[in-house]
Design a protein with these regions (language model features):
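Short glycine/serine/threonine-rich phosphate/pyrophosphate-binding segments
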Residues: 18-21, 41-45, 96-103, 121-125
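A glycine/threonine-rich phosphate-anchoring loop and its flanking beta-alpha core
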Residues: 107-188
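Short glycine/serine/threonine-biased micro-segments
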Residues: 12, 89-93, 167-169
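ATP/NTP phosphate-donor binding region
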Residues: 1-88
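A short, small-residue-rich loop immediately preceding and capping a beta-strand
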Residues: 80-118
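Redox-cofactor binding/interface segments in oxidoreductases and associated redox assembly factors
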Residues: 34, 91, 153
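Short, conserved catalytic/metal-binding motifs centered on acidic residues
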Residues: 14, 95, 174
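Glycine-/small-residue-rich active-site loops that bind phosphorylated ligands and cofactors
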Residues: 40, 67-69, 96, 119, ...
């Protein structure tokens, strides 16, 4: 049986990498739409701006409404993508934000870059977006044809994330290990 590795096209990890974000995305396009929460922008906005100051790419910021829903995806597409001429989608935040960025990129056929700010989910690297209703109830899985073009893990940002979320990420990784072993044993 063949073994296949499915992963992002490029994975970048290290301290201070958000300060180089603009340089990393230059090859994907010239105008990036950065999806981020307002509180996230207060924490890392200066690093993102510095990364684009040293780049030929420019950025526009869209504040995420905290729910990965079809309504939110449509809002972002209508207000920012269709009217803003962006050619790259960047999601900076947690799992729901990453899933929203991937869904927006999928529906608009744009490259996507995911920069997690917590290490508690596998959403940044997966070819899947989980969509919810506006009330936070599960709606659907959106299976994507490819993984993100770039996943950038700024370890300075991750090191400052809440401990409970890091512990949750460790638990998720351990569970994934046992899930993979069970799948392999069953021949799935």
């Amino acid at each position: 049986m063949a073994k296949i590795l499915i992963s992002p096209s490029k994975y970048i990890q290290g301290p201070g990498e958000l300060k180089k974000l603009g340089q990393y995305v230059e090859n994907l396009g010239k105008k990036a739409l950065v999806l981020i929460t307002e509180s996230g922008y207060k924490r890392v906005g200066s690093a993102i701006e510095a990364g684009f100051n040293d780049s030929q790419a420019v950025m526009d910021v869209c504040y995420f409404n905290r729910e990965c829903s079809k309504v939110e995806v449509d809002r972002i597409i209508d207000k920012y993508v269709n009217q803003g001429d962006c050619d790259i989608i960047i999601g900076i935040g947690g799992g729901k934000l990453a899933d929203t960025a991937k869904a927006v990129a999928y529906y608009t056929k744009k490259p996507v870059v995911v920069c997690p700010t917590i290490a508690s989910t596998d959403a940044p690297c997966s070819a899947l977006s989980v969509l919810y209703t506006e009330d936070g109830v599960f709606d659907q899985y959106l299976f994507l044809p490819k993984n993100p073009d770039i996943v950038m893990m700024d370890t300075e940002v991750i090191s400052k994330s809440p401990v409970r979320l890091t512990v949750a990420g460790i638990g998720d990784a351990l569970a994934t290990y046992f899930e993979a072993r069970a799948c392999k044993a069953s021949g799935a």
